[in-house]
């Protein structure tokens, strides 16, 4: 009889910690529920689902805004390199020319030629387009950084979305047009002036055109991402 009592006592002592932990967990859950109800007494299961949905939506929205920020940084850098290289493209070459007149058999003179980007309308067009894209991208980067920090829009997000899509598409078309015209001018210069020693100017012009085309691609991609943000999150 004593052994049975001892075994039952041992089993009771083993079960007591389990029951105690369950009671503690139940008390913790009750306290949490009371705190939630105190914070929002009208909270229901439907409201909780809405909150969770909005939270997941905001996380996706932040990811798209981060992607847009990265694209705008690339556009900013490409435009900066494009107009910086084009603005520095200057060269002076000496071209040998043979002259013949009635009193001599002919002689050779060296005529200096100076190459400056602002002497061609195509290069001026490309320079202006990249400067505009550079300034616009810088302003957009500042705005996106401010939004990611504060999570607040400075203006109506729908209105801003329409503005972003319109300006991104416009600048993409302008950069494509400017890059194409500058590439044509550089190709025409290469056909004649490359053999006369103007290779440095032509190479810098081609490098600027390449960066301008990359800036066009960045703005086209930014327009696409801005449209996705406008359609899905505003």
Swiss-Prot record:
Parts forming coiled coils: none
Membrane topology note: Multi-pass membrane protein
Endpoints of the signal sequence: none
Compartments (UniProt record): Cell membrane
Topological domain spans for side Cytoplasmic: 1-65, 150-169, 232-234
Chief location bin: membrane
Positions bearing carbohydrate: 98, 206
Stored InterPro entries: CASP_dom
Ranges facing Extracellular side: 87-128, 190-210
Region (Disordered): 1-24
Keyword entries, A-Z: Cell membrane, Glycoprotein, Membrane, Transmembrane, Transmembrane helix
Extent of Basic and acidic residues compositional bias: 11-21
Transmembrane segments: 66-86, 129-149, 170-189, 211-231
Any Gene Ontology CC annotation: plasma membrane
Induction details: During Rhizobium meliloti-mediated root nodulation.
Family of the protein in this entry: Belongs to the Casparian strip membrane proteins (CASP) family.
Subunit structure: Homodimer and heterodimers.
Name used for this protein in its record: CASP-like protein N24
């Amino acid at each position: 009889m004593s052994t049975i009592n001892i075994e039952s006592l041992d089993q009771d002592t083993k079960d007591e910690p389990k029951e105690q932990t369950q009671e503690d967990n139940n008390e913790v859950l009750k306290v949490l529920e009371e705190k939630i109800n105190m914070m929002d007494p009208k909270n229901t299961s439907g409201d909780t689902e809405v909150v969770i949905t909005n939270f997941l939506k905001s996380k996706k929205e932040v990811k798209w805004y981060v992607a847009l920020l990265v694209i705008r940084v690339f556009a900013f850098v490409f435009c900066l390199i494009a107009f910086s290289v084009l603005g520095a493209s200057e060269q002076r070459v000496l071209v040998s020319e043979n002259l013949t007149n009635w009193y001599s058999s002919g002689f050779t003179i060296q005529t200096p030629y100076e190459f400056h980007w602002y002497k061609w309308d195509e290069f001026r067009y490309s320079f202006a387009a990249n400067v505009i894209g550079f300034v616009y991208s810088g302003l957009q980067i500042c705005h996106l950084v401010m939004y990611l920090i504060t999570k607040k829009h400075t203006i109506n997000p729908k209105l801003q979305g329409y503005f972003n899509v319109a300006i991104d598409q416009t600048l993409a078309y302008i950069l494509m047009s400017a890059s194409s015209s500058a590439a044509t001018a550089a190709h025409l210069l290469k056909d004649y002036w490359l053999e006369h020693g103007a290779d440095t100017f032509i190479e810098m012009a081609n490098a600027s055109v390449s960066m301008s085309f990359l800036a066009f691609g960045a703005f086209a991609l930014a327009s696409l991402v801005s449209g996705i943000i406008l359609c899905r999150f505003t």
